[in-house]
Structure formats: C-alpha cells, structure tokens
C-alpha cells in the first residue's frame, strides 16, 4: 500500500548552530556566508514547533518539550512517530547528536561546553551516548572531522 504521509527527516529540519561558514566559488573566490537559522517549514505545525524548541531553547527531553508546548507528552510522542516514522526519543537524540557532531567538527568548544549546549547532564553522559551511537569517542571524532584551520572556515 502506498504511503499517504511523507516522513519528515532530520536533514529537512536540522538547523546548524554555526553563524557563518566560508564558501569557495568555482572561480576560486571565497566569502563568509551567513548560515540561515530560520525554521524551514516542514508542512507540520507540530514539527516546526518542536524544531524551534530544539534549536532555540536546546531542550531535548520529551516531557520538557511537551510542557513548553502545553501538550500531553504521550500524544506529542505519538504525533512525532507519525511525522518521522521513528520514536520521538530517537528523533531527539539524533537531532542532538547532529549538533554535537557539528560543534566537535567546527568549533573549539570544550566537551563540557558542548554537553551544556546540547542539554546533556554531564560531559561523561555526552561521551557515553556519543561513543555508543556514533561508534567513536568525541575526541576521536573531532580529530578526524575538524579541519586544522577550522577557524578560517567557520564562525560560531
């Protein structure tokens, strides 16, 4: 049976925490380009509201997101399951880990600063979740994904 509802992916709604990134054009010229922070409409008011909370308030706990929205957490989780095709907890963790990956690759923020920015209870909690889900430690990820001259390429 054909799917009636198109699933919304994290790639469609993710917002980078960076302020600007350097872009190199085909002619070799470069500029620092603003990174947009506007919510890209997903077609769902629920999803757009959740993404706004995730990005601007950095809240990643289902109960806290539901409280901010003034809705029942179970109903919100059910709606998110329908919209994304995955449990809300998985969606929140993937979104949050995307932020962590970008902070590790593009900034010199310490792991404890990143943990605080991404609503982890501690640096060790972030390290544990990151290593389990991504398959390497945050330090190893940073070493293999961050440009040596990252400050030239990114502003945060």
Please annotate each region the language model reported:
Residues 83, 100, 133:
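DNA major-groove recognition helices of helix-turn-helix
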Residues 1-55, 62-63, 67-74, 83, ...:
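Alpha-helical bundle regulatory/interaction domains
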């Amino acid at each position: 049976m054909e799917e009636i509802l198109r699933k919304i992916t994290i790639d469609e709604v993710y917002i980078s925490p960076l302020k600007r990134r350097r872009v190199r054009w085909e002619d070799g010229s470069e500029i620092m380009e603003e990174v947009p922070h506007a919510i890209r409409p997903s077609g769902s008011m629920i999803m757009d509201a959740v993404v706004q909370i995730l990005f601007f308030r950095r809240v990643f706990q289902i109960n806290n997101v539901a409280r901010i929205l003034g809705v029942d957490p179970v109903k919100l989780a059910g709606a998110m399951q329908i919209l994304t095709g995955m449990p809300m907890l998985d969606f929140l963790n993937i979104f949050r880990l995307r932020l962590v990956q970008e902070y590790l690759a593009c900034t010199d923020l310490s792991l404890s600063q990143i943990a605080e920015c991404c609503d982890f209870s501690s640096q060790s909690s972030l390290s544990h979740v990151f290593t389990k889900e991504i398959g390497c430690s945050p330090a190893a990820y940073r070493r293999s994904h961050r440009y040596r001259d990252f400050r030239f390429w990114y502003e945060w």
